[in-house]
Amino acid sequence: GQTDLIPVVLFIYALTFIKRTNFRVAGVLFACSIAAKHSMIIGVPFVILYLWSHNGNHKEFQNFLKLFFGSLLLFEFPFFFSDAFRMMVLENREMDKIYWLFIDMGKENLIYLTPLVYMLLLYFFWRIRRVNFDLLLASMGVAFSIVILMTPSPPGWYLWLVPIFAIHQSRHGFGAIVLVGFFSLFFIAFHLLHTSGASTILFDYNQINISIVQSPIVQSIHYTLMVGMGFLIAIQILREGVRENDYYRLGNRPVSLGIAGDSGSGKDTFTKSITTLFGRHSVVTLSGDDYHLWDRYIPHYHHSYKH
């Protein structure tokens, strides 16, 4: 687990440079994080789509890609011809866990659910088009959650979620803190009770041995609750990220529209059409006639100041 700290720190540090629009340094740091642990590549497609969605950064986007792929090739190429590197890294049995959850369609046709859900999330992120940095963080947090929660991942992988969960709690208050708190309790209790090698420093024995919690059914229920809490947090992160990505804040702030034109040009007709479209409960109409000193249909209107 402690070896996951280095790639996670490098990855989060790279994101800070994305926030500062220093894409060249970010590209190098992302390459370093992937070289430290290949699983960090999970978040890179979201970063690429984020940079691509900002039309004003084409040149910087190209620089990011050049430095990212160039640095990654520089770090990895010397080891490509090593049998030990191929066996321990490229053929690591931990990577096969993403294929453990599947639907058997018969005739040796399997639908692998973890890659499928990841691709659907990536497609959803791409279709939003205009993406802000908060939604980038949210989507990557959900992507890492998908890989971790839908595979029998070791405890160290959960370190990938710590920065995202910490940011989520700091921004969204009590509800987020409660969910992450319950998830943490379920996680610690599960590995304390059911994972070999777990030990308690306070008590002088390696694993708590309570017969009722050692049964497969209780263990499975415990694991289901832990994964369920993790998915609830992922849904909450994605929901808040989409809500904050509302570019013009149309869902939270009223919008003012000014309709101008000569008399008889159809201003009132257009206003009534908008009111019908959105509903009278959602529209407040302020007419210029409301600011006249005299009604337009009485003689004073034509022989005095109108306003």
Can you describe what each PLM-predicted range is?
Residues 268:
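Walker A/P-loop
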Residues 284-287, 293-307:
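Conserved nucleotide-sensing/catalytic segment adjacent to the nucleotide-binding pocket
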Residues 275-285:
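Post-Walker A helix-loop "phosphate-sensing" segment adjacent to the P-loop in P-loop NTPases
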Residues 96-101, 303-305:
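N-terminal intrinsically disordered, low-complexity segments enriched in P/E/S/T
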Residues 1-91, 108-253:
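Multi-pass membrane glycosyltransferase architecture that uses lipid-linked
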Residues 256-258:
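Short hydrophobic/aromatic beta-strand immediately N-terminal to the Walker A/P-loop
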Residues 263:
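The conserved Walker
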